[in-house]
């Protein structure tokens, strides 16, 4: 996870939150970080005035290998996750991008005939940082999560088709067919991307450590296209051949599993 990568930096004090929650902590003054890494590059830009897009991810279905329903989930997750006797977890769309991206993926799946409404209704909502811990404890049979989360927890997962997993920039127009409303705001599907920035000089080394090491990010389950990092909003490129762990003045504020977010009328 990003928290793991950040924690490998000497002196870093990473703090994990869903991206929307992390942004609100900074915006409200409850946290004053030296660096940020979130699953919404647009949120980073709002807070720092610039951002580097440094990684991608994919939605997956993670499942408990010890669940009696594991074979059914592996055979056909669409049908299995709609069954009332199979417990499913997802995160809160009002608190983190994973939550609304899950709903966007279900919207796309529903357009292909999957029982999306039944799956959504059957899924309980958990904080992002507790989702897979709950699964590991036997609290749910399956959960919608990022690929890097499954890798970090060493859990089996089902790769969704590229048409559903929000991972492929070439399918951006297809993803935008999906839309969900959260808090009165319409969010459209977009490829998943991660953004980072440093807010103080003290945060720059940690930022560079995160953004620079593409191989380590890939090892942790993230995708890193050859052209990344891409810096926006700065004349000079502070990420060239380098990147960060999030480290705060107070405790660091970073999203554990943190696309330019696809919000209409932003």
Residue ranges of model-derived segments:
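Exported/periplasmic ABC-transporter solute-binding proteins
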Residues: 1-7, 20, 65-266
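N-terminal segment of the mature folded domain
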Residues: 1-89
């Amino acid at each position: 996870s990003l928290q793991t990568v950040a924690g490998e930096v000497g002196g870093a004090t990473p703090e994990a939150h869903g991206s929307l929650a992390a942004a609100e902590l900074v915006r409200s003054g409850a946290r004053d970080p030296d660096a940020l890494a979130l699953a919404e590059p647009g949120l980073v830009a709002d807070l720092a005035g610039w951002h580097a897009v440094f990684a991608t991810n994919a939605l997956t279905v993670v499942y408990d290998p010890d669940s009696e329903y594991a074979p059914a989930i592996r055979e056909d997750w669409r049908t299995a996750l709609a069954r009332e006797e199979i417990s499913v977890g997802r995160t809160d769309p009002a608190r983190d991008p994973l939550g609304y991206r899950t709903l966007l993926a279900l919207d796309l799946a529903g357009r292909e005939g999957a029982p999306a409404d039944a799956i959504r209704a059957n899924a309980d909502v958990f904080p992002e940082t507790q989702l897979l811990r709950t699964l590991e404890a036997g609290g749910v049979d399956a959960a919608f999560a990022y690929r890097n989360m499954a890798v970090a927890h060493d859990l089996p997962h089902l790769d969704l088709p590229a048409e559903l997993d929000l991972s492929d920039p070439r399918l951006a127009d297809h993803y935008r067919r999906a839309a969900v409303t959260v808090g009165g705001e319409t969010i459209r599907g977009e490829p998943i991307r991660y953004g980072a920035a440093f807010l103080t000089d003290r945060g720059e080394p940690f930022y560079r450590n995160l953004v620079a090491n593409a191989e380590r990010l890939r090892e942790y389950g993230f995708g890193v296209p050859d052209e990344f990092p891409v810096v926006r909003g700065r004349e000079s490129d502070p990420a060239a051949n380098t990147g960060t762990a999030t480290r705060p003045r107070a405790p660091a504020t970073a999203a554990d599993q943190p696309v330019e977010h696809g919000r209409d009328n932003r």
